[in-house]
Structures are given as structure tokens and as C-alpha cells.
């Protein structure tokens, strides 16, 4: 963010800036730090050869391919890392120095993402507990407070110090094992005299020192043996040795005692120590100071720590994650070099630096990181907003973090320190609620991984405030004015009493007592929440839903700007990278659908445009030129709009005419009634591109062939194939047709293996024995559309493990239909229930039929009244041909500011259009509507307006499914579950009750037997249906009951049923 000299203006930072800064920090600092840790490697036998890297000579090479080519050819967009290495012979002091290639590092593109194997991937920032010491108090089973101090290492390991009733201090190395703090300090190198000199309460340490502990801490070896015995839970008497010390160092001290730079700073600040920053390991002095503070806590001195406060958290950014992986790759490279040197000397070969180093460790480490690490995710590209929001996520999950199953409510809850740093609204729904957050707009990651937020410093001598960034540990000591104190007139501010924040409490103070103030109304919201107009009138749960649903909106074929917005639409569109921006000024000399040629500074620049590309959510990405030929443009001007942008502004939905009223029950329970105009005029029509892929392999019988000559297939299924056997571009394909013809070789069976009648049939019909089987790529159900692209990616090299890949892209045009999901920007969502003819829709007093009918009962109970303000203001803006950009919390200027704005605009629209029904004082914002079927007016006036409605990606074409036949589970013999497996619908316990309530016994029996798991009965249904007659009723038990009987038998329980005769009451036993 940039502040100017006027002291009141600032610019919003780039939304991708955090990703860029993290990657630059890794390239500038992280590489150097890890390379400097690479040790000098000596030969293990005679130590005559020494290998080392020269850190200052490393350099990265510009990639040989472009981003588009990397995506097209499924390659990684990376840079080669070179560094000078030296091989020194100690006997002769000769050194051989060479520049070697040690691997590829994936680069970050202009969107803040990386391209790995042709896929856009992004690294999520992680929130971890900051290393240091934290004191807390818990009640034991007797209701007595137990004080503990937890030391967290840089690796995430924990060492707990606790004090018992007798004021004895223990170090707990595991849940069951604990050891005296005197033994731990002695094992770390201190003797009893040093311990007593460095503590504030020596008498307490001496009070619980018995004879055994005196003997143990008398020597370091005895203390280490005692500690090893407790830590490793070994019996007997272990013998002190170097291997024992090495094992203890690796398993305990390295994991639980390495604090790192951040941990050392936190430890020094919390315990008032002055240990140098380069001492990153836990020292005996730290342990003793922590014990002193724990004793003080026991007697009421000191304060407990809030572990959920952001000052006790740190951000593990993309720089830290990439640096950790680079360090891991160098450790692997070290072991490779060491083995290679030993092998060369063993075989009496002369090694060179070039022969010792391989690029495999670095390349494979980063490939596995981007492909398998939980914090490396595939970039969600549903719409432009989704792309920028994805890179600003914060996760408590991942390695070293929390788990969704064990995280408590307190960890998920909003903390006051989130103000201006983490959005209190934007989070996931479901099991990850509160664990996946989003950065606030102005937040940045500072040194040490702390989240910083900007404030204006209020100075008594000058009206111009300085803009300062504060970490969570600093701003709690200042009086911070809340966001509603951003009045324009400073004179008004000085007279009023304003709400403020101080030490996580909310106070009311005079203006002259305030130290800091917020800089922006959106400062504490994320991007998604900042795009909701009138958000202050909505319940937070509905605002959360809206933030998530805006990321699910599909780009429409005809985008439209929102009438009522917040002003951040242009910034979101710009930073998403979906628009084409002029890199320099010049003149447009040629424009087309696929490129724009710009002339300036004596040369020409060709700017390629994105045409009908597929996102990973099957939505379309397309750029449309917005500048005519011959126009002079400036640097930074928009040349082409993206799939969901208009004029450089984000455009995710449509402004449609909406009425809030019931209509024959078709909008019951959030259902939505729409007009056929939305279908016929392509208002909510969207394009979706599906990808179908096939690979050719070399089998044991020979290579697979791509051909258009497929035997035993009907000709109309092959009509769209070209001479190579691949579907032609521009073809219209239906479900079941062949996209790629492929034959896989198979071993021909001998003639004698066939049955006699089959051999006779082959001889009569002249059928030859086939040596290959058909394995064509067929279009699945629901995939009909137009073929827009075919890619045949040839394999590089002759390896059979690197097959050829053929990809077919099919474009589908989807109008809105019954079953699709639509939503507003206030959490008001619904499913299309019916599409009415436009003449049957309710119409306004000027004859215009409405486009959508929402249920009015969905507003008061959900407390998202912001949709009513947007609805009415959008109607006024449509009549006045205006667009509004509303900042949130406008009541900071005056009471009822939102209502006054809406009513004033409606009144002006009523005057300018000479339509008094637009604003009627008796029921402002409402109007009398007429029934389109009868022409009669409705009894009550209805709220009408033009809100911004989105079409979401949850579409009925992707979800509707029916099963006529399919596979059955092997164990239960019931139909499989899921659309992808052609599964069936489960008739569960409550469904059976419902059918029983209606008395449909025969229907219920069919569902539980023929259509489910009665094997014998369902086999007889097909023949009976073909030949006619009644379907036989099943007599024995279905397979699921038989399975239950077998499972009970495995528990030694026998279950049988008996039939009792009515005549002689004899029991006839029958096996289950």
C-alpha cells in the first residue's frame, strides 16, 4: 500500500502481492540461506577428497518455454538452477571447479501461481503456533488449578513444564513420562551450583532434591542415562555411549529444543532474557528461567498466555514452504554426492564435480511437494474472483497444524486480534469452519511471519496522519478508533465520542484520547465479503454464505455489470489476470478475436488472446477485444475483457427484475419461479467445456493403434472420425459416439477353444478370429456438444512409459433450467422450480413482466435485509440509468443512511419517469402487481427491484441421474452408490417408514427385493417381462439379511426362523 503526502489517501495493495513477495523472498534469501548450510563433503575412507558448493555463484536461467506452451504440452514452467562446485584434493591442494546444474525450480507466474505438469497450482499460507513458551492454567479432577508452561520448538515439538501441589517442577517428555527439571538441566550441561545461581527461588529447588537426584545430577553422564531411560522407556541399566547421545539428540533435542530465530525472539521477550539471536537451541538458562516464571504463576505473579491471539501465531508462507523443500532436497543431494564419491574411490575412478551431482533430488522433491503436499492445491478457476481469493486463503490445517476432527470450538472462533488481519466472515462451511480463513484486504505478512495491519497515527501537532503497519503484539497497547469514526469532517470528529479498541476490549472514548484509526471501511473484510453491498444489514452467517457462493458463480455468455456494487469490482478484475492490459502506449493497428497488434516506439507488439479455454471446473475462459482498430491507447488500459468482466469490472451475474411474493407454492422453501425470457433471450446461458482424454500404450502383445477402422461397430458411431481415427473439430457429437478410435492387440484364441456351435456360426457368417479388441474413447451420457479442440500430444523419446495423449474438448451451451441453483449476494439462494411463460408472470403497472419471483418469508427469519436495499436501489438505478458504489457501514455518517439513500433515489426515479407508482409514500419500495393469468391486481403491494442474481455451478445437468441397470456390490449385492458408478438411490429407514405410512406394500416389496439385493428374484424379472405373465414373488430372504446372519455367526450367534403350523402346532425348522 502506498500513502501520499495528503495523509488521508492510500491505494489498495495488489491482491496477489502476498504470493509475489513470498516467492521473491525465497529466491533472494531462502536459496542463499539453504545453500550456505550445505556442508563440505569429505571422503569417508582416507579423507583425501573434499567437495563444496560456492554459494555466491548460483544463478537461475530464464525458462526455455512460455507459460502457454507449458500448459499445452503438460510441462512444468521452471527455471534451471546452476552453481559453481569445487572438488579439492588435499594432498596436492589442487581444485577442480565447474558450474553444475542441480535441478529445476518451478517459477511463479503473473497470477501468483505455478504451472506443474501443465496444471496451475497454488500454495496456501498456513497459520501455526509460534515457537516459544506459553503458560496456561487448567483444573484437575479435584478442581485445583494446575499451571503448566509449554515450550514449542521450530519443528512443532513440545516440551511441557508443570508444577505439582508440592511445588515440584517436572518436565513432561510424553503423556506418561515425566522427569525432574534438575535432571533435564543437568543432562543439558548444567551442574547443581550453576542451577542454583541462575534461579530466583533456589530454596524451592533444594526442597525437593533427594539423595537419588543428588547422585544423578552429580555428573552429566548419569543425568543423560537417567533422562534416556525415562525418554525412551527402556528397562535395565543403559550404558553411556556416543551412539546413545546421538540418538537422544536426534529424537529429542533436535525436535523439541530447536527454537529458530522466531522462537529465540519470543523466548527472550517472554522470559526477559538477553541470549544472542544466533543461539537458536534451547539452553539450560531458558529452562531455569521458564521454571522461575512457572513458580511465579503458582503464587499469582505474571499473566497467562492466550494461545489463540495472533501475536502467538506465525504465518508459514510460500517462501517458508519452498525453502523447507529446498533444504530437504539439498540433504538428499548431500547423501547422493557422498555415496558417489565413495563409489568412485572404491572403483579407482577420478571424480569431477559434474559427475558427482545429479538434478534428480531437487526436481523430484519439488514435483512431489506440488503434487502431494496438502497446502499445494490445484488453482480453482471457476471465475475471476475465485482465482484471487484462492491465493489469499489461510489454513490452520496441514503438517504441524490442527486437524479438522480434533480442533475445538475455541480454536475455530473469531479472536479480537483478527481485526484488520483475518476476515471474521469469510471461512469454509462444514467441518473446516474456522480452520480455513481469508486474509483481510490490507493485511500483509511482516518479518517473522506476523500478520500486520495498517493504521493512521493521530498526531496532535498535525492534521496529517502517518500510515503505520502494526503487528498484533503492538496495536493492543494503543487506543484504536473503530471503522465508524471515518467521518469526512475532522471538526465533527474532534467533538464526538467514538468507539475504540484497547487490549481486546471495546470502549467509548473522546476523540483526543485516540492514538490510531482505521484507514478504510473494508479494512477488516476479505475480497469476497467486500463485494457485498449493504453487508452491515446482513446476518454474519448469510454474509459467509454469500462470500462462498460468489466463488461458485459461472461466467455467463453475456456478462453485465452490477447496478449496485461496492467499488472493488475493478480491482478484483484487474488482479485476477483475466483481462488483457496494455503493457505500453501506442496505436491499435490490427484487432481480431485471437490477437491484438499494438504499434508504438518504432516496433509492433502482438498480444494473443485467450479463446475458449477450459478451467478445471469446466467453465469457459475467453477474452473479447474492447478496442477498435486505429485507437490510441495508454499504458495500463484494458484491451480485452475476460469471461466474467465488463469494462474491466467484475461481472458475475445479471440485473433482473424480481418480485418478493408467493406464487401458487412454486417458491416454497427457497424455490424460485422464473420467466421463460431468461431462457429464450440467453440471459443466464453459460458455456461449459469438458475434456475427454485417452492414452495409447505399448502392451505385451504390441502397441495400441489409433484408427478409424473399428470392426463390429455401426457406421453412424464412426461418422465424425477423420482418417487418423480422431474426431474432427467442429463436429456435433451425441452420447455414445466415438471420439477416438483405438484397437488394443490381444492374443488370438485357438479354434479348438470355441464351442462347436460357435465354430459353425463363424463358418456360416464368415467371421474371422479377432486379434484385437475395441477400446475406443466414447462420449458418456450427458456429454453432447460441439468439438472445439483436439490435441494430440506426441510422446518425447521412445519410452513406453511416456505414452501419447489425445485430448478432446467439447463445448456445451447450457440455458437455465429447472433444477439449477441461483443466488444473490446476501446468502439468498434457491433452486429453479418452474419456468413460466412470460405472459403468465406477474407484471408491473407499466406492463413489464417480472423475471423472478422469490419467497418473501426467506428474508425476516434469515436477517439478510441487505437484499431489500439492493433490490430497491437497483430498481431506481435501472430507471435513472445510474450505477452505485456503496461503501459498507454508511450509518457512521448519520442514522438510517441506507434507507434515506434508497428512498431518495426511488423518489427521484418516480419524478423523472413520471411514474408515481415507483415511489408511493404509503408503502415505499413496494408496488401493486397484476396477475398475468387473470389481469387482476394482487391483494397486497409487493417489493419489486433489480438485484444482482448469480447462476451457480451446481447445475442439474451435472447432478441428475437415473439407473435402469448397473453394477452391484459384491458383498451386499445391492446397487452401487454414486452417479459416476451408475449407482442407485438408497431407500433408507425413513423412506421405508414413509412408504409404510401410505400402505404401498407391493411397491415397498419391489424396492427391497427385485430392485435391490434379492438375486434370484431380480434374475427372473427380465424373462418374465419379455415373455409376459406375472412376476413371481420372492420366497426366501434377500442377500442383505443373509449377510446379517453370516456376520452374527462369526460372533458365535446362530439366527434361525421357524414356521408354526396352525393345525398341529408343530415347529418346522427352516434354515436361513
Swiss-Prot record:
For biological process, the GO terms are: DNA-templated transcription
Chemical reaction(s) catalysed: RNA(n) + a ribonucleoside 5'-triphosphate = RNA(n+1) + diphosphate
Cited SUPFAM superfamilies = beta and beta-prime subunits of DNA dependent RNA-polymerase
GO cellular component terms, A-Z? chloroplast; DNA-directed RNA polymerase complex; mitochondrion
Query: Could you say which EC number(s) this protein's record lists?
Result: 2.7.7.6
Tell me where it resides: Plastid, Chloroplast
Name the Pfam families for this protein.
RNA_pol_Rpb2_2 (PF04561), RNA_pol_Rpb2_3 (PF04565), RNA_pol_Rpb2_6 (PF00562), RNA_pol_Rpb2_7 (PF04560)
Keywords, ordered alphabetically: Chloroplast, DNA-directed RNA polymerase, Nucleotidyltransferase, Plastid, Transcription, Transferase
Where the protein is mainly located, per its record?
A: plastid
- GO MF term list: DNA binding; DNA-directed RNA polymerase activity; ribonucleoside binding
Q: Which family does it belong to?
A: Belongs to the RNA polymerase beta chain family.
Name the PANTHER family on file. Answer: DNA-DIRECTED RNA POLYMERASE I SUBUNIT 2
Question: What is the protein's quaternary organization?
Answer: In plastids the minimal PEP RNA polymerase catalytic core is composed of four subunits: alpha, beta, beta', and beta''. When a (nuclear-encoded) sigma factor is associated with the core the holoenzyme is formed, which can initiate transcription.
**So what does this one do?**
DNA-dependent RNA polymerase catalyzes the transcription of DNA into RNA using the four ribonucleoside triphosphates as substrates.
Annotated protein name in UniProt: DNA-directed RNA polymerase subunit beta
State the organism of origin. Oenothera elata subsp. hookeri
What is the gene called? rpoB
Amino acid at each position: 500500500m502506498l500513502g501520499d503526502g495528503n495523509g488521508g489517501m492510500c491505494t489498495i495493495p495488489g491482491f496477489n502481492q502476498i504470493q509475489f513477495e513470498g516467492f521473491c523472498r525465497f529466491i533472494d534469501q531462502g536459496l542463499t540461506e539453504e545453500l550456505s548450510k550445505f556442508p563440505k563433503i569429505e571422503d569417508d575412507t582416507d579423507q583425501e577428497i573434499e567437495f563444496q558448493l560456492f554459494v555466491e555463484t548460483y544463478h537461475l536461467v530464464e525458462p526455455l518455454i512460455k507459460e502457454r506452451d507449458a500448459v499445452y504440452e503438460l510441462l512444468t514452467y521452471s527455471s534451471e538452477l546452476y552453481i559453481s562446485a569445487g572438488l579439492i584434493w588435499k594432498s596436492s591442494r589442487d581444485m577442480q571447479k565447474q558450474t553444475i546444474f542441480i535441478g529445476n525450480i518451478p517459477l511463479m507466474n503473473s497470477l501468483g501461481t505455478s504451472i506443474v505438469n501443465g496444471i496451475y497450482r497454488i500454495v496456501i499460507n498456513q497459520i501455526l503456533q509460534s515457537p516459544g513458551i506459553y503458560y496456561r492454567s487448567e483444573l484437575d479432577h479435584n478442581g485445583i488449578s494446575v499451571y503448566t508452561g509449554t515450550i514449542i520448538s521450530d519443528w512443532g515439538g513440545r516440551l511441557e513444564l508443570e508444577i505439582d501441589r508440592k511445588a515440584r517442577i517436572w518436565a513432561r517428555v510424553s503423556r506418561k513420562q515425566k522427569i525432574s527439571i534438575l535432571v533435564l538441566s543437568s543432562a543439558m550441561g548444567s551442574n547443581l551450583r550453576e542451577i542454583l545461581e541462575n534461579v530466583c527461588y533456589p530454596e524451592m529447588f533444594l526442597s525437593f532434591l533427594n539423595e537419588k537426584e543428588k547422585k544423578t545430577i552429580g555428573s552429566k553422564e548419569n543425568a543423560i542415562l537417567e533422562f534416556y531411560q525415562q525418554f525412551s522407556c527402556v528397562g535395565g541399566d543403559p550404558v553411556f555411549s556416543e551412539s546413545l547421545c546421538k540418538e537422544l539428540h536426534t529424537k529429542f533435542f533436535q525436535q523439541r529444543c530447536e527454537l529458530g530465530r522466531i522462537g529465540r525472539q519470543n523466548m527472550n521477550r517472554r522470559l526477559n532474557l538477553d541470549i544472542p539471536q544466533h543461539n537458536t537451541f534451547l539452553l539450560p538458562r531458558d529452562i531455569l528461567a521458564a521454571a522461575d516464571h512457572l513458580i511465579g504463576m503458582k503464587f499469582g505473579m505474571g499473566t497467562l498466555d492466550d494461545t489463540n491471539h495472533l501475536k502467538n501465531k506465525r504465518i508459514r508462507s510460500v517462501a517458508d514452504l519452498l525453502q523447507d523443500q529446498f533444504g530437504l532436497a539439498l540433504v538428499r543431494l548431500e547423501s547422493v554426492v557422498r555415496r558417489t564419491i565413495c563409489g568412485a574411490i572404491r572403483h579407482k575412478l577420478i571424480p569431477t564435480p559434474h559427475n558427482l551431482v545429479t538434478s534428480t533430488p531437487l526436481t523430484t522433491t519439488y514435483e512431489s511437494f506440488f503434487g502431494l503436499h496438502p497446502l499445494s492445491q490445484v488453482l480453482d478457476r471457476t471465475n475471476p474472483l475465485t482465482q484471487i481469493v484462492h491465493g489469499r486463503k489461510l489454513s490452520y490445517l496441514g503438517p504441524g497444524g490442527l486437524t479438522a476432527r480434533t480442533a475445538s470450538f475455541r480454536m475455530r472462533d473469531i479472536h479480537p486480534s483478527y481485526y484488520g488481519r483475518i476476515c471474521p466472515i469469510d471461512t469454509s462451511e462444514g467441518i473446516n469452519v474456522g480452520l480455513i480463513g481469508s486474509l483481510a484486504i490490507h493485511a500483509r505478512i511482516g518479518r517473522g511471519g506476523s500478520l500486520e495491519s495498517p493504521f493512521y497515527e493521530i498526531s496532535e501537532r498535525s492534521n496529517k496522519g502517518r500510515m503505520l503497519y502494526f503487528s498484533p503484539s503492538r496495536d493492543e497497547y494503543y487506543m484504536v478508533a473503530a471503522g465508524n469514526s471515518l467521518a469526512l469532517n475532522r471538526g465533527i470528529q474532534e467533538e464526538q465520542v467514538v468507539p475504540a479498541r484497547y487490549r481486546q476490549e471495546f470502549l467509548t472514548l473522546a476523540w483526543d484520547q485516540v492514538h490510531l484509526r482505521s484507514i478504510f471501511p473494508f479494512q477488516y473484510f476479505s475480497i469476497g465479503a467486500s463485494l457485498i453491498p449493504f453487508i452491515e444489514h446482513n446476518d454474519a452467517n448469510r454474509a459467509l454464505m454469500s462470500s462462498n457462493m460468489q466463488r461458485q458463480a459461472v461466467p455467463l455468455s453475456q456478462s453485465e455489470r452490477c447496478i449496485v456494487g461496492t467499488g472493488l469490482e475493478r480491482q478484483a478484475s484487474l488482479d485476477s489476470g483475466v483481462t488483457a492490459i496494455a503493457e505500453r502506449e501506442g496505436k491499435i493497428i490490427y484487432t481480431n478475436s485471437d490477437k491484438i497488434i499494438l504499434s508504438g516506439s518504432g516496433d509492433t507488439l502482438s498480444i494473443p488472446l485467450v479463446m475458449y479455454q477450459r478451467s478445471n471446473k469446466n467453465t469457459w475462459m475467453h477474452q473479447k477485444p474492447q478496442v477498435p482498430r486505429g485507437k490510441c491507447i495508454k499504458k495500463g488500459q484494458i484491451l480485452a475483457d475476460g469471461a466474467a468482466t465488463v469494462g474491466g469490472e467484475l461481472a458475475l451475474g445479471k440485473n433482473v427484475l424480481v418480485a418478493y411474493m408467493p406464487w401458487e407454492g412454486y417458491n416454497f422453501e427457497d424455490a424460485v419461479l422464473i420467466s421463460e425470457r431468461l431462457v429464450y433471450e440467453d440471459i443466464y446461458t453459460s458455456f461449459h467445456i469438458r475434456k475427454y482424454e485417452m492414452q495409447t500404450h505399448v502392451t505385451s502383445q504390441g502397441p495400441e493403434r489409433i484408427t478409424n477402422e473399428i470392426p463390429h461397430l455401426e457406421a453412424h458411431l464412426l461418422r465424425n472420425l477423420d482418417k487418423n481415427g480422431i474426431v474432427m473439430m467442429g463436429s456435433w457429437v451425441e452420447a455414445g459416439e466415438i471420439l477416438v478410435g483405438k484397437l488394443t492387440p490381444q492374443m488370438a484364441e485357438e479354434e479348438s477353444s470355441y464351442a462347436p456351435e460357435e465354430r459353425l456360426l463363424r463358418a456360416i457368417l464368415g467371421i474371422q478370429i479377432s486379434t484385437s479388441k475395441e477400446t475406443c474413447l466414447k462420449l458418456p451420457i450427458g456429454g453432447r456438444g460441439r468439438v472445439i479442440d483436439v490435441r494430440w500430444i506426441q510422446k518425447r523419446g521412445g519410452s513406453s512409459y511416456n505414452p501419447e495423449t489425445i485430448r478432446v474438448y467439447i463445448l456445451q451451451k447450457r440455458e437455465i433450467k429447472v433444477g439449477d441453483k441461483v443466488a444473490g449476494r446476501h446468502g439468498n439462494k434457491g433452486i429453479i422450480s418452474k419456468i413460466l411463460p412470460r405472459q403468465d408472470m406477474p407484471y408491473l403497472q407499466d406492463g413489464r413482466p417480472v423475471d423472478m419471483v422469490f419467497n418473501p418469508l426467506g428474508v425476516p427469519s434469515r436477517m439478510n435485509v441487505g437484499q431489500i436495499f439492493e433490490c430497491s436501489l437497483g430498481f431506481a438505478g435501472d430507471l435513472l440509468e445510474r450505477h452505485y458504489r456503496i461503501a459498507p457501514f454508511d450509518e457512521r455518517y448519520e442514522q438510517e443512511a441506507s434507507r434515506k439513500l434508497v428512498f431518495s433515489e426511488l423518489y427521484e426515479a418516480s419524478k423523472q419517469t413520471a411514474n408515481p407508482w415507483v415511489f408511493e409514500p404509503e408503502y415505499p419500495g413496494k408496488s401493486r402487481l397484476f396477475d398475468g393469468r387473470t389481469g387482476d391486481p394482487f391483494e397486497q403491494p409487493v417489493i419489486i427491484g433489480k438485484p444482482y442474481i448469480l447462476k451457480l455451478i451446481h447445475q442439474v445437468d451435472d447432478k441428475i441421474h437415473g439407473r435402469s441397470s448397473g453394477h452391484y456390490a459384491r458383498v451386499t449385492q445391492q446397487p452401487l452408490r454414486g452417479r459416476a458408478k451408475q449407482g442407485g438411490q438408497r431407500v433408507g429407514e425413513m423412506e421405508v417408514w414413509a412408504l409404510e405410512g401410505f400402505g404401498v406394500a407391493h411397491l415397498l416389496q419391489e424396492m427391497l427385493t427385485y430392485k435391490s439385493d434379492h438375486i434370484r428374484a431380480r434374475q427372473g424379472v427380465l424373462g418374465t417381462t419379455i415373455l409376459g405373465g406375472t412376476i413371481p414373488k420372492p420366497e426366501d430372504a434377500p442377500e442383505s439379511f443373509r449377510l446379517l446372519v453370516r456376520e452374527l455367526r462369526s460372533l458365535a450367534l446362530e439366527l434361525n426362523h421357524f414356521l408354526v403350523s396352525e393345525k398341529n402346532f408343530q415347529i418346522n425348522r427352516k434354515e436361513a
